[in-house]
UniProtKB/Swiss-Prot annotation:
The keyword Iron applies. InterPro entries: Ferrochelatase, Ferrochelatase_AS, Ferrochelatase_C, Ferrochelatase_N. GO terms for cellular component: cytoplasm. GO terms for biological process: heme biosynthetic process. Its EC number is 4.98.1.1. Belongs to the ferrochelatase family. Fe cation binds at residues 209, 290. It catalyses: heme b + 2 H(+) = protoporphyrin IX + Fe(2+). It is found in: Cytoplasm. GO terms for molecular function: ferrochelatase activity; metal ion binding. Its main location: cytoplasm. This is Ferrochelatase.
Amino acid sequence: MSFHTEPPYTHGSLPKTAVLLVNLGTPDAPTTSAVRTYLNEFLSDPRVVEIPRVIWWFILKLIILPFRSGKSAKKYAAIWSNEGSPLRVHTEKQAKLLTGYLGARGHEVRVEYAMRYGSPSVPEVLRKLKADGCDRILVLPAYPQYSGTTTASIFDAVFKHYARERNVPELRFVKHYHDHESYIRALQKSVLAHWDMAGRPDKLVMSFHGVPKRTLTLGDPYFCECHKTARLLAKELDLTEDQYVVTFQSRFGKAEWLQPYTAPTLQKLAKSGVKRVDVLCPGFTSDCLETLEEIGIEVRRDFLQAGGQDFNYIACLNENDAWIKALAQIAELHMIGWPTILSPALLEERNEEARISLAEAQRLGAQQ
């Protein structure tokens, strides 16, 4: 196996720390060709679709991509902004705000973002961080709840990249933060702010992205972590069990997924006499196709056509101040022990050590 070419090693330089915020991904444009490229990468991941590769290849290449790409492109076009894909726009802004927040707290930390599928890709950003001298990297998935279909796939991408690197940086990974106090508090503030403006609903629906039910029986903790998030948020909102419901959306294919499904549940609520619902998607930290189009357009239509009168979608955390603060606290927790905050005296001491190392290396014949 061949290895990637390493940048020249520089003596006397201080190692840097970086946080890599990773989201799912998005097409580069709301066009059939761009969506086809994106779906091909996404649905080719064995973490996402656990079907024998040969069988799945024919299904993907001959059925799904030819017929689904155009339909999905129209949906992306409905939510595309002048800045681009909402998911990419929000994730990029979160990374910039997190940089500022950590810097204001005294951390010397660089924050970059990447997409598991699409661009900027995980390998692309990891190469960039290496070229800039980052020797400590915290991988922070944008998924509060862990799943082998999402979080683990990010870890796979990182491991796969470094399997061909000679000089591997120190790595840390955030597995989940579904029950982190600051994350729950950010959700609470978002919901309360909406209620202050629009009033309370008859029912709060917490809709999480679905996964095949078999993943639960095979040991994936995602279902349990979603319910724990919902329970903790309901407690902070002083909701009783009959005032909220947990559902799962975005079912793909014919296999059974985690239930209850979001759209049928909303239809059932409307037919049972529930007039107003608020829908929140706690597992999505950035608004995207699944929230803006699936929930904001399709599920809204289903609820109203079934007899409901008032449907409100509560936006994702996006660039919410409380969420950026939560991200910072989660990152700080996982960077404990890394020298990201140095006093002037300690910084000067480290710089002096670096100068001594450089001088000694040059004495031994090093060029840089």
